[in-house]
Curated annotation (Swiss-Prot):
Residues 1345-1372, 1383-1393 have a biased composition (Polar residues). One of its GO terms (biological process) is pexophagy. Residues 80-89, 1042-1061 have a biased composition (Low complexity). Residues 1230-1239 have a biased composition (Acidic residues). Residues 1209-1229 have a biased composition (Basic and acidic residues). One of its GO terms (cellular component) is phagophore assembly site membrane. One of its GO terms (molecular function) is protein kinase binding. It is found in: Preautophagosomal structure membrane; Vacuole membrane. This is Autophagy-related protein 11. The lineage of its organism: Eukaryota, Fungi, Dikarya, Ascomycota, Pezizomycotina. It is a peripheral membrane protein. Belongs to the ATG11 family. Residues 71-99, 1024-1061, 1209-1241, 1336-1429 are annotated as: Disordered. Homodimer.
Length: 1429
């Protein structure tokens, strides 16, 4: 058996044959011969941390070896063994070959590929060596950690055992210190107590074993407890007690310190070991192997490309182009990747070596710490063992004897009393027994004499003197005469004296318990008293101790007390039984209704209850009531019915509970979905808030930096100002010493002048720094403006990128659903891409596995077919042979019947011959003389008889053999038929499995092909069957999407098409090939199988995997790029979110926006409209706080928007005043109370308009109109400016809209001339969804189709219309951010120019709308080139 030997400090692993080792020394010598560790320095442990004990019969599988030289701290001047530290390896990867002689020559390219292949092979070999070295380092680390774990386990076992002993000693020492302190301090009190308590002199002499001569020399006095103590020894112990107590306490204190230090060091070591295990580098084990596989895969790719180039013979243009592309691919990707991974492999080896060296150093430190802790544990253990064995504790033993002397005396007295009482009882019982036996003896003697006189004298011997009745003699041997005679009164007097002297309460309690134990009965007496149990008498217990119980007054008293107690219990139980019977009778008669009163009213039932209660008091009424129990059967039947109904209700409750559980499960599922959605929203909001906090912190840091610079500048200026003042004050303080320090003053003056010059220079320098800082701030402002412009542009790109990202994510999700419809779609895009890659790899593995199974199945089918052919031939041969055997058997049977007939005939002849022979013999016996003829005949008959007997035996034997052969052939035929049926069943099952595998393989192949087509690839095959996967041109992709020209979402095409799992195999034209195993002939089966395998094998899985891998990687790269851009756009958009809140809106009005309200031309109705671009008919509801009569404009924040439609037909009918309006926030219609609210601004019928409630946000408008100015004139000017802006934008359209429709006053007139019915049914008055195709044209028409649009700003060329529904007015924050990021509204000032601002807004609006479409198309084209249509 091989034993693994692990070396702790080097990490080596040795193997030793345990059969050749017989002892531990032999093991150490074997290990020392293979390592550099001497035998005397070897330490061996088991994996459990125990010391090794060699057992040749059951050797250990692993042994851990340690070097004791490394586990000890090196002494100064002593030589320590060298540490096991390996040098750090360095790997330098050579530059891959990249030179070629002739780029137009195929051999030159082949030579280049060959050199690159050789370089790659060398790198792979180097990486393999580094991988082996890395794994060896990790194996050494594993060995070190395991050895360290065993050492720590050894220490833990030792410390745990020591800790238990220390805890026990600590508990004992605490109580011992208190006891020893009490003994040392109460020594004099104990002696005075012993001196004052009198005792019996005889007991004192008995306890001290002194003879009478020792007491005769002393004066006659009353003996006390002091006489029982050796006074000299006691006084000496009293003197030594304080010093012994102090030494004991010091020893316990030192032990506590040492043990605490030991346990703390052990805990620290355990914590460090756990930390070392947690941060171990073993978790990185295996990385080098994965990296080596990647390098080998890249090298194999280079090798494959080299083999492909060897096939090229001619230097054609296409061949050179293909070779150059492959070489460029190697140069750009493969070779740098191999070089990079080789360097990474070297770094991994270096990291593993560093970790190994670090762990070796740590393990040595651990070993040294463990050695120190172990030595400390030995010292603590020796202290613990020595604590309870010191000679000083004998002092306290003497003191404890003095303290316990009253109890000892009381115990001796009680023992003397017990012995005397027992002896008296034994004497009394023996006398009683002797008397009783004497009576029995006399009665037996009288009976014998009477019998002998009457009967015995007739027979038998005469009575003699020896024929006496056996007698019983009782002798008591031994005597307790040595013990003094003591009585209970002596013990009671001693106890009372002890209490009067106020002895220790504990001592008094112990003596009192001792006195009480004297009255307790023995175990045999207790069994005698408890002989009556469970209604029977235990005669065994009654007879064993009957003598000792008889005549004992104490036992009689205890028996009487037990009898009284049992009688009281019996009375209590009887009274309780009566009460329970009474309650049961009441419940039976009063609570349960009988048959007669089931339908009584409550009053009658109350009367019945009263009657029943009164009847309980009357015995006769109780008898009458008891007779009414005959109706209980009816009640029992009723009870059964109620129980049946109760069971029915319980079943119904169970059904309801199941329904409730199902609803609860459904509710929990819905709640879980809601929680998941809320968590997703919460995560998004947290991300946005985190970005906001980052920008805020950055802005604060910049502001703090500016503040610090300003404070520094101010501080420097203050120093310059106070510099002169401080010098003047200093000069004034030294005026009294001017005549002594004139030279010093001059020197100080010169220094001050120099300092002033330096300060001036510093001021100039700080001024220059401040100027540079201002310039830097100005440059930052410029950069900030440029960044704001860039953010506007990027925000537009962000919208397009976000939409495309959502589309392509949906496409990836559809691909996931096609690949794994049963699994959940991952939420993160990288997880989704990795999942798709994994699913594709699983599909490839499944296909390869199916192909392998098909090949195995084919081999099995061929084997089975051969077996079937062999079995069929054997069956045919067996049938033929069986037929022959049956015919032979028939012939044999016929022959057997013939032979049997012959045998019967021969038996008859034989019987006849025997008769004749018998007759002949009779005649011969009678004396007749026969002739020679008779003798010959007799001989012939005998010969015939013998031959016929032999023939009969041979025929019987042959018949028996034939029957056995027939039976054997029948068994063989049955066995062959069974094998044939089993093989047929097995062949059918394998055929079904082959059919399933064929269908599965075909469906997988078809799904993979369609997956490539949907990913934007096209598959082409050459004549030799080689498959090529190419990108589908964009023109063909566009043809694939012409089914729905309005649907540009690539995921929609995937959704329109059937899923990968939905297409059945039966729809394929090659259905017959899937049934190749059901062919009629073997030749057709083989032919169909070959065709099927050719079609299946045409899909090259390597090419497919490479194409899908590259596509997924490209999509992943693009997704990361889009994520980075989206993150940047989102960060920049958040920084301007607050600014957009304070800008004036001119389109897409919603609650919370700032709007500029201007008066319209219709001054008679007091109509004020919101400044807008393409969003007319937003009128202001006038309030008293607005003071519109004294204003030219009003900037207010929108609080509410109400949508209304003018309907003049209601005013003609006079049925009900009111109209339908729609709230902009909730989309609900309400009715007005009067006609004035229906059309307050005299608008035309069928017109949709909006009433705005706003609160002034920016006061400061002039109170009165300026001189020679009016709102109508301002509006006219603005309308002209808008018309010029429109002409500037559209250029070719002029004043006409789409299709030549006039957009000026003529358009307004033509719009107003429409009929009421047509205007109500027009598209301008209907609610339309936002972002619908053609909404932009309707927005332009509706924008200029009203006579109340005072601000005739021509709308920009956009794709959005007025917010005509509640969904658009309740936009999400993201949509609001998109809308606000596309707007650039002017800031409100005290004086506003409507003309200039309308032109600027229109221009910026056009620019903001044109840029997203361009960016969208660019990003769309870039992503389509990666993922396909």
């Amino acid at each position: 058996m091989v034993t693994q030997v692990l070396i702790a400090h080097t990490g080596q692993r040795l193997e030793i044959d345990s059969r050749t080792i017989t002892s531990l020394n032999g093991l150490k010598e074997s290990v020392a011969s293979q390592t550099s560790i001497p035998v005397e320095c070897l330490i061996a442990l088991t994996p459990q941390g125990r010391s090794l004990r060699w057992q040749p019969t059951q050797p250990e599988t692993e042994i851990y070896i340690y070097d004791s030289r490394l586990t000890q701290r090196s002494q100064p001047g002593a030589s320590s063994p060298p540490l096991s530290e390996l040098p750090l390896p360095r790997y330098n990867a050579h530059t891959p070959p990249n030179s070629i002689e002739d780029t137009r020559s195929i051999p030159a390219w082949q030579k280049l590929f060959e050199t690159r292949r050789a370089w790659a092979i060398d790198v792979v070999e180097d990486c393999a060596r580094m991988d082996a070295a890395t794994r060896e380092r990790y194996a050494e680390m594993d060995v070190m950690l395991r050895c360290l774990d065993a050492a720590v386990a050894n220490l833990e076992n030792a410390v745990k055992g020591l800790e238990n002993k220390y805890v026990e000693l600590k508990e004992w020492s605490t109580s011992a210190q208190a006891e020893y302190s009490a003994l040392a301090t109460g020594f004099d009190r104990y002696l005075s107590l012993a001196r004052g308590i009198a005792i019996s002199s005889s007991m004192a002499r008995f306890m001290t074993s002194r003879d009478d001569g020792g007491w005769k020399g002393r004066p006659q006095r009353q003996s006390t407890l002091e006489d029982l103590v050796d006074l000299e020894l006691a006084r000496q112990a009293g003197k030594l007690a304080p010093s012994a107590l102090r030494k004991f306490k010091d020893r316990i204190t030192n032990l506590d310190k040492a043990a605490t230090h030991l346990f703390q060091d052990a805990d620290t070591l355990m914590h460090k070991f756990e930390t070392t295990m947690s941060r171990s580098a073993l978790s990185h084990d295996g990385e080098s192997l994965h990296l080596l596989k990647d390098i080998e895969a890249l090298a194999n790719k280079i090798d494959n490309d080299y083999n492909v180039t060897l096939e090229y013979t001619s230097s054609t243009r296409d061949t050179l182009l293909q070779v150059s592309k492959t070489a460029a691919h190697h140069t750009e990707r493969l070779l740098p990747s191999i070089q990079k991974r080789a360097l990474e492999m070297g770094d991994i080896l270096c990291y593993a070596t560093k970790a190994r060296n670090s762990l070796a150093a740590e393990s040595i430190e651990f070993m040294r710490s463990i050695t120190e802790i172990t030595s400390d544990s030995h010292s603590v253990k020796s202290q613990i063992s020595e604590t309870g064995q010191e000679d000083e504790l004998a002092t306290f033993d003497h003191l404890r004897l003095i303290q316990q002397i009253p109890y000892l005396y009381a115990s001796f007295v009680a023992e003397a009393i017990r012995r005397r009482e027992w002896l008296d009882k034994v004497k009394q019982d023996s006398t009683t027994l002797a008397n009783e036996m004497a009576i029995f003896h006399e009665e037996e003697a009288k009976r014998r004499r009477r019998w002998h006189k009457s009967i015995g004298a007739v027979f038998g011997p005469a009575p003699t003197a020896d024929s006496k009745v056996p007698n019983l003699e009782i002798n008591l041997r031994g005597d307790d005469g040595e013990w003094p005679l003591m009585t209970r009164k002596d013990l009671d007097d001693f106890f009372n004296a002890l209490r009067n002297q106020k002895a220790d309460p504990e001592l008094v309690v112990e003596i009192e318990k001792l006195i009480a134990d004297m009255d307790k009965s023995t175990r045999q007496q207790s069994r005698r008293m408890k002989a009556f149990k469970n209604g029977s008498v235990h005669e065994t217990a009654l007879g064993r101790s009957g003598l000792l119980v008889r005549g004992d007054d104490d036992l009689l008293r205890s028996l009487q007390a037990d009898k009284t107690r049992l009688e009281s219990k019996l009375k209590t139980a009887e009274s309780r039984v009566r009460r329970l019977e009474d309650l049961l009778h009441r419940q039976t008669q009063a609570s349960r209704p009988n048959v007669g009163n089931l339908f009584q009213n409550p009053s009658q039932q109350v009367l019945d209850r009263n009657d029943s209660i009164s009847s309980l008091r009357n015995p006769r009424a109780v008898d009458d009531r008891s007779r009414s129990l005959d109706g209980l059967e009816t009640l029992i039947h009723r009870t059964q019915q109620l129980e049946t109904e109760l069971n029915t209700e319980r079943e119904r409750c169970v059904v309801l509970e199941r329904e409730i559980n199902a609803l609860t499960t459904l509710h929990n599922d819905l709640k879980g979905q809601m929680d998941e959605a809320n968590s997703t929203k919460k995560d998004l909001l947290q991300n946005m808030e985190a970005l906001k906090r980052e920008f805020t912190e950055e802005r604060k840091s910049l502001e703090e930096e500016v503040k610090q610079l300003k404070a520094r500048l101010e501080y420097t200026e203050d120093e310059i100002e106070h510099f002169g003042e401080s010098r003047e004050n200093e000069k004034a303080s030294y005026d009294e010493k001017v005549h002594f320090l004139e030279l010093e003053v001059e020197r100080l003056t010169r220094e001050r002048r120099d300092d002033s010059l330096k300060a001036d220079d510093q001021v100039v320098l700080l001024q220059n720094e401040a100027r540079l800082q201002r310039e830097r701030i100005a440059a930052q402002d410029i950069e900030l403006r440029a960044a704001q412009d860039e953010i506007r542009v990027l925000s537009k790109r962000l919208e397009a990128v976000t939409e495309d990202k959502q589309k392509y994510r949906q496409a990836l999700e559809d691909i996931w659903e096609c690949l794994a419809p049963a699994d959940d779609v991952p939420t993160e895009l990288p997880d989704l891409l990795e999942g798709i890659t994994g699913k594709a790899a699983d599909i490839l593995n499944t296909k390869q596995g199916v192909e392998g199974d098909m090949s195995l199945m084919k081999l099995n089918v061929d084997t089975l077919q051969n077996n079937i052919r062999t079995l069929r031939s054997e069956m045919d041969f067996t049938k033929d042979r069986l037929t022959e055997e049956e015919s032979v058997s028939l012939r044999l049977r016929e022959k057997f019947s013939e032979e049997r007939a012959k045998v019967v005939a021969m038996e008859g002849e034989l019987a006849h011959g025997r008769e004749q022979l018998h007759e002949f013999r009779v005649k011969i016996a009678d004396g007749e003389t026969g002739s020679e003829y008779m003798r010959k005949r007799l001989e012939d008959e005998e010969q015939n008889l013998a031959s016929m007997t032999e023939e009969l035996a041979a025929g019987q034997t042959q018949v028996q053999k034939m029957e056995e052969e027939v039976t054997r052939f029948k068994a063989k035929l049955h066995q062959t038929q069974m094998q044939l049926s089993e093989l047929s069943i097995r062949l059918e099952s394998r055929t079904e499995c082959a059919k399933d595998l064929t269908q599965l393989l075909w469906s997988q192949n078809d799904r993979l092909t369609r997956l490539l087509e949907r990913l934007g690839f096209s598959i082409s095959r050459e004549e030799d069957g080689t498959m090529h996967i190419q990108r589908t041109p964009r023109s063909e992709r566009s043809l694939a999407t012409t089914a729905n020209p309005n649907d540009s979402d690539p995921s929609s095409s995937l959704r329109r098409s059937s899923t990968l799992n939905a297409r059945p195999v039966t729809d394929n034209a090659d259905l017959e090939l899937l049934q190749w195993m059901s062919s009629a002939t073997p030749e057709a089966e083989v032919e169909k199988y070959k065709i099927f395998m050719g079609l299946i094998g045409s899909l090259d899985m390597d090419v497919f995997a490479d194409a899908v891998y590259r596509r997924v990687k490209d999509v992943e790269h693009m997704a990361r790029k889009l994520q980075r851009e989206a993150r940047a756009y989102r960060e920049k958009a958040h920084s301007f979110q607050k600014e957009a809140h304070d800008k004036i809106a001119f389109k897409h009005f919603k609650e919370g926006d700032l709007a500029l309200f201007l008066p319209t031309r219709n001054q008679s109705t007091g109509a004020w409209a919101a400044f807008n671009v393409g969003f007319p008919h937003y009128f202001l509801r006038e309030q008293d706080s607005h003071r519109l009569r004294n204003r030219e404009w009003l900037v207010a924040r929108i609080m509410r928007i109400q949508e209304r439609v003018v309907d003049l037909s209601k005013s003609l009918q006079h049925d009900q005043a009111g109209e339908t309006r729609k709230d902009g926030a909730r989309g609900e219609t309400e009715s007005l109370d009067d006609d004035e609210n229906d059309n307050p601004f005299d608008l035309s019928d069928g017109l949709r308009w909006y009433l705005i409630e706003a609160v002034e946000d920016k006061p400061g408008a002039p109170s009165t109109p300026g001189l020679a100015k009016s709102t109508v004139a301002a509006n006219n000017v603005e309308a002209m400016a808008d018309m010029r802006t429109q002409g500037h934008i559209s250029k070719a359209r002029g004043l006409t809209g789409r299709g030549g429709t006039p957009l000026g006053i003529e358009g307004v007139s033509k719009t107003l001339s429409k009929s009421l019915e047509s205007r109500r049914s027009s598209t301008g008055s209907r609610k339309t969804l936002p972002f619908v195709i053609g909404a932009s044209s309707r927005g332009r028409e509706s924008a200029l189709a009203s006579e109340t649009n005072s601000l005739r700003a021509v709308p920009a060329d956009n794709n959005s219309s007025a917010p005509t529904n509640a969904a658009q007015q309740h936009m999400s924050p993201t949509d609001k951010l998109k809308d606000e990021s596309l707007q650039e509204t002017p800031q409100q000032t005290n004086s506003i120019s409507a003309e200039g601002e309308s032109m600027t807004i229109a221009a910026r609006n056009d620019q903001a709308i044109l840029q997203p479409s361009q960016t969208h198309s660019e990003v769309r084209n870039e992503i389509e080139s990666l993922i396909g249509p």
